[in-house]
Amino acid sequence: DCTRMFGACRRDSDCCPHLGCKPTSKYCAWDGTI
């Protein structure tokens, strides 16, 4: 299972593919990959 866009996270691996964890806001956002 993975965290979707704007879901809470602690690290990049928590997030779904093509999403990364924003360290300041602690949510998953697009990491720029396709």
Swiss-Prot record:
InterPro entries the UniProt entry points to: Huwentoxin-1
Keyword Secreted on entry: yes
Family the UniProt entry places it in: Belongs to the neurotoxin 10 (Hwtx-1) family. 57 (ScTx1) subfamily.
Pfam entry (one): Toxin_12
Lineage: Eukaryota, Metazoa, Ecdysozoa, Arthropoda, Chelicerata
Tissue-specific expression: Expressed by the venom gland.
Domain of life: Eukaryota
Protein name (record): Kappa-theraphotoxin-Sc1a
Membrane-spanning parts: none
Disulfide bonds listed in the record: C2-C16, C9-C21, C15-C28
Residues that bear Isoleucine amide: I34
